[in-house]
Amino acid sequence: MTSIESHPEQYWAAAGRPGPVPLALGPVHPGGPTLIDLLMALFGLSTNADLGGANADIEGDDTDRRAHAADAARKFSANEANAAEQMQGVGAQGMAQMASGIGGALSGALGGVMGPLTQLPQQAMQAGQGAMQPLMSAMQQAQGADGLAAVDGARLLDSIGGEPGLGSGAGGGDVGGGGAGGTTPTGYLGPPPVPTSSPPTTPAGAPTKSATMPPPGGASPASAHMGAAGMPMVPPGAMGARGEGSGQEKPVEKRVTAPAVPNGQPVKGRLTVPPSAPTTKPTDGKPVVRRRILLPEHKDFGRIAPDEKTDAGE
């Protein structure tokens, strides 16, 4: 980094120095009768002719230098004082910013530490509520089931005790006792199991449906299974002979044939392996070598002197 150095004292000293000495007139030849004397006199006069302008330029330059030196001395001093004031202000501002930054950092650190601590009670309450919900639901279900069982038992006993033909005679008592012994209506048991002799034909994905025969006497199925409005259903054992007759009836079996699967028949047959291609094997494991012998011609190739003599003698 380049630093600027200033010396106001030297600038003031330069501004207070005396001005330059003006140029003096040069000697002029007095002249003479000859041409040389005349030329020398003209040269001296022409040399001294521009001394006035040169002296004026020198004096103007000196005045300009003095003014610049004094201006530099004043401006550098004022600039130094202004820079010192600015540095003091920057230092104070920097200290304030540093203090605010330190305070912000400390508050952020404390917030990061205290944040989880303030959330601990809320998290504990949420965990307690989550743990209590299964217990509360189980208690509510238990209380609701006990209350419903007590109400249903009371209604069932009231309905059985209010029937006119159930309390007279031993037979009625036996029938009533059998009915109150916990028999379950056949309508709640669902369809009967399929016999093992005939495999079921109903697909696994199809819903099971029970087909029941209408009760004898033209009564609707709803009237046979449904009691009075708002009263529980009476077991078949408490209904006398009709209850026994309805209990012996069996529902009619219903067979459902599933649609055939396309291309689902098993494939029968045999696979024939094609014969392998014949291969050529070398004899005794060695390759067969073929040789070609070329015979030379009689007159063109391989003729020697005795052969020519023999041909000439022939």
Swiss-Prot record:
Bias kind Pro residues: ranges: 190-202
Main location: membrane
TM segment ranges: 23-43, 98-118, 221-241
Biased composition (Gly residues): 165-184
GO annotation, cellular component aspect: plasma membrane
Key words, A-Z: Cell membrane, Membrane, Transmembrane, Transmembrane helix
Signal peptide (from-to): none
Membrane topology: Multi-pass membrane protein
UniProt-annotated location(s): Cell membrane
Comp. bias (Low complexity): 203-212, 219-232
Bias type Basic and acidic residues, positions: 294-314
Keyword match Ion transport: no
Region (Disordered): 165-314
Key word Nucleotide-binding present: no
Coiled-coil boundaries: none
Protein's UniProt name: Uncharacterized protein MT2145
Lineage start: Bacteria, Bacillati, Actinomycetota, Actinomycetes, Mycobacteriales
